[in-house]
Each structure stands twice: as C-alpha cells, then as structure tokens.
C-alpha cells in the first residue's frame, strides 16, 4: 500500500464527509441568517430565538436528505470493505 493510495483514500473520505454534511450546514446557515435579519429588523435581542428554527430546519433537512446521505455513506463503506484485501495487501 503506497502513500499515494492512502492519501487518495483519505481525500475521498474527506470529500464524502463534506458532501454529506454540506446540505445540513447550508440549511442551518441560511436559517440562521434569516433569523438574524429578522432579529435585526425587529430589534429583538433574544439569543435563544435562533436555535429553535435552526433545529427544526436541520431535522426537516435530515428527513429530506437522509436517504441520499445514507446511500452515499453506504456506497463508500461498501466500496471500502469490498476492496479491503487490496488495501491490506
């Protein structure tokens, strides 16, 4: 097992991780921005107001993107374990 191979597998693992976490982080960022703009325009200074919409939005996004996220991580894991003898040898 060469160092280039290990680096490419680590790169693919990081890519899959970013691809899976990206939609949830983007939804949380967008909802947080909308709530912050709402708080700035109405001059509400409640710090806990931003958490509930973010949690609800991320849970809804998890329900929506969950099957895709699961299939993506499952295909990566299946590829990793099916080629394990090539990796170790």
From Swiss-Prot:
Regions that span the bilayer: 18-38, 55-75
This protein's UniProt keywords: Bacterial flagellum, Cell membrane, Membrane, Transmembrane, Transmembrane helix
Cellular component terms (Gene Ontology): bacterial-type flagellum basal body; plasma membrane
Membrane topology recorded in Swiss-Prot or TrEMBL: Multi-pass membrane protein
Pfam families noted in UniProt: Bac_export_3 (PF01313)
Principal localisation: membrane
GO BP terms, alphabetized: bacterial-type flagellum assembly; bacterial-type flagellum-dependent swarming motility; protein secretion
Cross-referenced InterPro entries: Bac_export_3, FliQ
Localisation per UniProt entry: Cell membrane; Bacterial flagellum basal body
Family: Belongs to the FliQ/MopD/SpaQ family.
Function recorded in the entry: Role in flagellar biosynthesis.
NCBIfam families: fliQ
Protein name, per record: Flagellar biosynthetic protein FliQ
Organism from which the protein derives: Bacillus subtilis (strain 168)
Lineage, uppermost ranks: Bacteria, Bacillati, Bacillota, Bacilli, Bacillales
């Amino acid at each position: 097992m060469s160092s280039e191979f290990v680096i490419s597998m680590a790169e693919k693992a990081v890519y899959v991780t970013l691809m899976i976490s990206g939609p949830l982080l983007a939804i949380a960022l967008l909802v947080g921005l909308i709530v912050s703009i709402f708080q700035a325009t109405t001059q509400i200074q409640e710090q806990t107001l931003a958490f509930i919409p973010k949690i609800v939005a991320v849970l809804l996004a998890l329900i929506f993107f969950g099957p895709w996220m699961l299939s993506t991580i499952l295909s990566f894991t299946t590829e990793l374990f099916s080629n394990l003898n090539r990796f170790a040898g």
